[in-house]
């Protein structure tokens, strides 16, 4: 009896030691990940410090610290249209991300519950939509917006962002809704709740993490989008941040390269989404992983 009782203990401790062990392949992988993280952080820090220097000192020693700090570089960037472009990007990106989630949530819920036999084929259509490159849609979208007079307008760009966001948003939320237990909906139905009331008052609050994840991912994607904005926006007043940055870099080639101003512009484009993603990274990761395997 003593021997038989001791055996499981030995096995359990051996299992713990095996789980705690890190193989050479995994150690190399972890090391490479940390190396990539360190390189990314150093590049971001270098970009921030360089944005506070003048062009001459940057050429003399690219890796030196700012001395003195030139906050005027950010004034130069704002005078080149970054302030107006930041407002345009925030309005279009935020509203498009919000509307895409609002439209995708009911569709994803219906597909996740397979309310009719068309749910499977419709889900496949949304999945296929993920593989359509934006370059293929560019010319048809341009002609359609030209017909309705919405080229070079922020509402037109808003509609484009909502449209191209739907396949991924529906796909992401479908997997998330499938991870939610169906027993809650059955209990609500027994209590007399309609399908609409069940969706709005029970399912949506439970899916809050998934909805926030979808919103943040679409917001970041819209904020950084350049292709459709470059093709559709023609007047400076409607430019978004990536377009103003590209124009600012082009202007410096003729005025004399203001490298400090260019790096300040890069910081203005990168910083908002970087801070937002860093703040909500845990919620985003948990929201994306909850629906895996369902």
Which residue stretches match the model-derived regions?
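A hydrophobic, multi-pass inner-membrane permease signature
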Residues: 2-294
